[in-house]
Structure formats: structure tokens, C-alpha cells
């Protein structure tokens, strides 16, 4: 292969001269790093590794790059959420704002085409970034056959890649429902929900977590009769603050129905109808069973790590009791030179978490400091209103016996939200009673998914509520509600409420 140096010149503003960065390629291996999986974690890690001077091979078995998030997850669902929100506003909200449109209709096929085109543009963008950063893409399913060797089975046969390091970034898959076969037409996963040919008249959603609420909202806005069935007594999934979850039932005012503390016993098709048998948990001790009919049932009970055919057992990597790949704080597995990030390891299954882990992991491989703060990972539910949170809930702090302060500021008292006609929701800040350090932030309201990022920045740098309260915020903005909540947490009272 030879010994190569690629010299890149970049301006150095610190010394006024030119800094030379050399890219040193491996002389004994086909690659310095093979990344298995080109989802959010994998493709970001591959690009960052290449930027740090490594020779990188990305292995991907799917026809398009970007993983679940980009192809059948985060991105297409946000396209549908945004466009159905606009449709809902045009149909129900524009008139009282002085906007007259006549009869408002939607074209479902055109809506789906828009989603497809958005996905294509972004997947194509990843391919261009690979070319720009000289990341080699190998198509096929990757299997680790030795600590320094990956075998890729593709349409053109088998290719073997010798490498110094291997990074597992294979993501996750839908958790199956016992005894149920998905046809992605009537009994569907989130993948099927993103590619239905028409809007069902009646839809049941099993699981009122992030995915269930988002996709349920899409079809409810388009006219479907949507009922979400949840085993727990709250909606929003794991990690949501219970006060936010309670307020979140504002979705019921929009037309979505909920059956909480309900266990689904079975799902079966009878002709063109799907029957779902459920029973309330309380009633299970002596109550009556109930069967509900629907046109489509969406099962969204979570995801599980995807490690199929990776060959982990062959190299001595044992999964934990939840099917995850165990790693240390540098994302190293029990086998030297093999690393793992994203949904296949511990922590929330979030695209942005995987991306950051990918960057930090490859920096560690290059000998750079490794730091990842799992207390500063935001979660967002992209419904209307949006929900965003970071770090501790009030329930967490009570369990820990932590002395804390809790203060809220309603969007009803925020000038921008009220002027925009979006007064529902609030910002809730939890802070240490003794030190004023922020312990958690929870938002339900307009732009909650954007506003939470300021709270994440504050969390990452260990800010106190006073720190945020003393930062000048533009007026009028919804972000002022975050400042006011921190002001209340710091000194006991906000200004505008």
C-alpha cells in the first residue's frame, strides 16, 4: 500500500502562520478504522475519524445511508409532523387570525412524496460528505471475524477488510410484540406508519411514548380516529416529568384519545379489520376484557439493540441482559480495538446521543481526552405543543432524597407565545436548594424542542439558575419563559407572572 502523507494547510490564527496537518495512513492494514453501520452515530464517527487523519471504511447493508433516523425515523416523521401541523392550522386556526383560504384539503400522496424527497436529499448529502472526507463506503452486511478483520457480504460477493480498529454502530430495531406478525399494512411499526397509502378511519396506537404520540398526532390531524393504549399511567414515555405528562393530555383536546394503565392481550386480523383485545391493569384482577376494532394498529412499544450476525460471540464479546454491547467510558468493548456506540450500548436511544458518542469515541482512538456527559442529553417529543427535557425529573429528585427548588413559568405570561396564540404549557426548572445549580429543565409549549438546547448548554457547563436568569434574552421571544423560570428558581419570583 505504501506510506502516504496527505498534507492539509489551514490558517492558524493563534500564531499568525500556517499550521500543517498530516494524514497518516496505515501501512499494514486496509484501514485504520472500520465503522459498521452508517446511521447518525456511524456516519458521523466515520467522517470525524477521517478528519482526524485516519483511513476509514464505512460498512452499510441498507441501500441508503443515514440509518433508521434518516430513512424511517426522525426525519420522515418530522416532515409529516410539520406538514400536518400546517394543514391543521390552515383548517382550524387561520380564520380567526384573519387569513381566509376557502376550503382546505390535503393531498396525502403529495404529502408522502414531500417526505420521500426530503429523505433523498439528506441521504445524498451523507454520500457527498463521505466523498469529501475520503471515507470509503463498502455496501453489504458486516461481520467481525477477528479482532482486526471485518467480512462484508454484499451483492457482488464477500470482501474482507483488515483494520486496526472496529466501531460497532448498528443501531436498533423495533421491539416485537409477542404473537403478532407485522404486515406493515394494517398491523404496522413506525416504518409502516410512514408509508401508508391512505389515512385510516380508525387507528389504535399501542404505546403512548415518543413514537406513538408523534405518529398518532400525524394521523389524528388528518382526520383519523386515534386511540393510544398505554400500559403505564402516564403518556410521553420514560424520562418525562409527571407534571409535564399530566399537562400533555392537552392532546386529548385536539381529538386524540387515551386508555392508560391498560394491558394489550392480543392483536389479530379478521378480514379488513384488526381486533385488539385489551384489559385494564386494575380490572385484570376481576374486570371485564374489551375488544376494540380498528383499520390500522400501530405498535410502538420501543426498540432493542441490533446485533444480528455481527459475529460478536466469535470474538468473545458477550451482550448484557438487555442485549446491549458492554463498553467502558471510552466506548471500548472487552476486546481491544473493538468499540461500540449508539443504540447498541447503554443510554437513551437517540440520534444525537449516538452522534456525540461517535465523535468522542474516535477522538479517544486518536489519543485525545474522552468526555461525555450523559446528564446533558436532551429529549424531545415533536408534537404540538412540543415537549423537551434534560436531566432530572422531580420524581428522580424525590427518590434520591435531594433537597431542591422547583419553579415554573407559564407561556400564558410570555408575550411572544400569547401574541402567537400559543399560550399552552410552561417551563419548569429544578435547582439545588443549597447551591442553586440547575438539576433539570422541562418544557412543554411552543418551540420546546428548540428552547431545550439553551437548558442543555447550561446543564453541560454546570450553570446555576442565577446564571441563566442574568443572561439578556431578546424580546419578545419564547426563550424569555426559560429565563423567567430560572429567575423564579434563583430569587423566588419571576418578573412577568
Curated annotation (Swiss-Prot):
It holds the Pfam family Pyr_redox_dim. One of its GO terms (molecular function) is dihydrolipoyl dehydrogenase (NADH) activity. GO terms for cellular component: mitochondrion; oxoglutarate dehydrogenase complex. It catalyses: N(6)-[(R)-dihydrolipoyl]-L-lysyl-[protein] + NAD(+) = N(6)-[(R)-lipoyl]-L-lysyl-[protein] + NADH + H(+). One of its GO terms (biological process) is 2-oxoglutarate metabolic process. Disulfide bonds join 69-74. The active site is at 475 (proton acceptor). The keyword Transport does not apply. FAD binds at residues 60-69, 78, 142, 170-172, 343, 349-352. It comes from the Eukaryota. Keywords: Cytoplasm, Disulfide bond, FAD, Flavoprotein, NAD, Oxidoreductase, Redox-active center. It is found in: Cytoplasm. InterPro entries: Class-I_Pyr_Nuc-Dis_Oxidored, FAD/NAD-bd_sf, FAD/NAD-binding_dom, FAD/NAD-linked_Rdtase_dimer_sf, Lipoamide_DH, Pyr_nuc-diS_OxRdtase, Pyr_nucl-diS_OxRdtase_dimer, Pyr_OxRdtase_I_AS. Binds 1 FAD per subunit. Homodimer. The active site is a redox-active disulfide bond. Belongs to the class-I pyridine nucleotide-disulfide oxidoreductase family. This is Dihydrolipoyl dehydrogenase. It comes from Manduca sexta (Tobacco hawkmoth).
Amino acid at each position: 500500500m505504501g506510506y502516504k502523507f496527505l498534507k492539509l494547510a489551514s490558517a492558524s490564527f493563534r500564531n499568525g502562520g500556517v499550521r500543517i496537518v498530516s494524514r497518516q495512513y496505515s501501512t499494514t492494514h486496509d484501514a485504520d478504522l472500520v465503522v459498521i453501520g452508517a446511521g447518525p452515530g456511524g456516519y458521523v464517527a466515520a467522517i470525524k475519524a477521517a478528519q482526524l487523519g485516519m483511513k476509514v471504511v464505512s460498512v452499510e447493508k441498507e441501500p441508503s445511508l443515514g440509518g433508521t433516523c434518516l430513512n424511517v425515523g426522525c426525519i420522515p416523521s418530522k416532515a409529516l409532523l410539520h406538514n400536518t401541523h400546517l394543514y391543521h392550522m390552515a383548517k382550524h386556526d387561520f380564520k380567526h387570525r384573519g387569513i381566509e383560504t376557502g376550503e382546505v384539503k390535503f393531498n396525502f400522496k403529495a404529502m408522502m412524496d414531500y417526505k420521500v424527497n426530503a429523505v433523498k436529499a439528506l441521504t445524498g448529502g451523507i454520500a457527498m460528505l463521505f466523498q469529501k472526507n475520503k471515507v470509503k463506503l463498502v455496501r453489504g452486511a458486516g461481520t467481525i471475524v477477528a479482532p482486526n478483520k471485518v467480512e462484508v457480504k454484499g451483492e457482488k460477493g464477500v470482501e474482507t477488510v483488515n483494520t486496526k480498529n472496529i466501531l460497532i454502530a448498528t443501531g436498533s430495531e423495533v421491539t416485537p410484540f409477542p404473537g403478532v406478525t407485522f404486515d406493515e399494512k394494517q398491523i404496522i411499526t413506525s416504518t409502516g406508519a410512514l408509508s401508508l397509502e391512505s389515512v385510516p378511519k380508525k387507528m389504535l396506537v399501542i404505546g403512548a411514548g415518543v413514537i406513538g404520540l408523534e405518529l398518532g398526532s400525524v394521523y389524528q390531524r388528518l382526520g383519523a380516529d386515534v386511540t393510544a393504549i398505554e400500559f403505564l399511567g402516564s403518556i410521553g414515555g420514560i424520562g418525562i416529568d409527571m407534571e409535564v405528562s399530566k399537562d400533555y393530555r392537552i392532546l386529548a383536546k385536539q381529538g386524540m384519545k387515551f386508555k392508560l394503565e391498560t394491558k394489550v392481550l392480543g392483536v389479530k386480523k379478521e378480514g379488513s379489520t384488526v381486533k385488539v383485545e385489551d384489559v385494564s391493569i386494575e380490572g385484570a384482577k376481576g374486570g371485564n376484557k374489551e375488544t376494540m376494532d380498528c383499520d390500522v394498529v400501530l405498535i410502538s412499544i420501543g426498540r432493542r439493540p441490533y446485533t444480528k450476525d455481527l459475529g460478536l460471540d466469535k470474538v468473545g464479546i458477550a451482550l448484557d441482559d438487555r442485549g446491549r454491547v458492554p463498553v467502558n467510558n471510552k466506548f471500548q468493548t472487552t476486546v481491544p480495538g473493538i468499540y461500540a456506540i449508539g443504540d447498541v450500548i447503554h443510554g437513551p436511544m437517540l440520534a444525537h446521543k449516538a452522534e456525540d458518542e461517535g465523535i468522542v469515541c474516535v477522538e479517544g482512538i486518536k489519543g485525545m481526552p474522552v468526555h461525555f456527559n450523559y446528564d446533558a442529553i436532551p429529549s424531545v417529543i415533536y408534537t404540538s405543543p412540543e415537549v423537551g427535557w434534560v436531566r432530572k425529573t422531580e420524581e428522580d429528585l424525590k427518590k434520591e432524597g435531594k433537597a431542591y427548588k422547583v419553579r415554573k413559568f407559564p407561556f400564558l405570561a410570555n408575550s411572544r407565545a400569547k401574541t402567537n396564540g400559543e399560550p399552552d404549557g410552561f417551563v419548569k426548572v429544578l435547582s439545588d436548594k443549597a447551591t442553586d445549580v440547575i438539576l433539570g429543565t422541562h418544557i412543554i409549549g411552543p418551540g420546546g424542542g428548540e428552547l431545550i438546547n439553551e437548558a442543555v448548554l447550561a446543564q453541560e457547563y454546570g450553570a446555576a439558575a442565577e446564571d441563566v436568569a442574568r443572561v439578556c434574552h431578546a424580546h419578545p421571544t419564547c426563550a424569555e419563559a426559560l429565563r423567567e423560570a430560572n429567575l423564579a428558581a434563583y430569587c423566588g419570583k419571576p418578573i412577568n407572572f
